[in-house]
Amino acid sequence: MGMAQSSSSSSRPSDSEQLEEPSKPVMALDKAKEIVASSPVVVFSKTYCPFCARVKRLLAELAASYKAVELDVESDGSELQSALADWTGQRTVPCVFIKGKHIGGCDDTMAMHKGGNLVPLLTEAGAIATPSL
């Protein structure tokens, strides 16, 4: 019986270690979700990424307001990118959100625009001002 107690007590420290381990990813996920909730349009991006530049250029051409989070500049950018991958299943940038909903990357955003669905979604999100009549 003494052995059973020692084996169960030895498993406890590993349990507590496992509980402490995910704190950084959980914090990054919470931060990513806060960022997404803070703005109608959020683009997780990298400053040197041509696909990110293309999406940001499109949003600028559409006069859409958006928040860009440059993961290569953020001190916790790599943790944020991992958290986004866990959350959305998308590891690459740009990672676009509109009204809190994951839209996808560059190809997804461009396809949505080409299909005529992006502007209405941006307008509904309040990112594009509707002209007064």
From Swiss-Prot:
InterPro entries: GLR_AS, Glutaredoxin, Glutaredoxin_euk/vir, Glutaredoxin_subgr, Thioredoxin-like_sf
One Pfam family per UniProt: Glutaredoxin
Transit peptide location on this chain: 1-27
Gene Ontology MF terms: glutathione disulfide oxidoreductase activity
Positions of region (Disordered): 1-25
Source taxon at top rank: Eukaryota
Subcellular location: Plastid, Chloroplast
Low complexity bias (residue ranges): 1-13
Disulphide bond pairs: C49-C52
Alphabetical UniProt keywords: Chloroplast, Disulfide bond, Electron transport, Plastid, Redox-active center, Transit peptide, Transport
Ranges where the Glutaredoxin domain occurs: 29-129
GO cellular component terms, A-Z: chloroplast; cytoplasm
One example of a Gene Ontology biological process annotation: cellular response to oxidative stress
Family stated for the protein in its record: Belongs to the glutaredoxin family. CPYC subfamily.
Task of the protein: Has a glutathione-disulfide oxidoreductase activity in the presence of NADPH and glutathione reductase. Reduces low molecular weight disulfides and proteins.
Record's protein name: Glutaredoxin-C4, chloroplastic
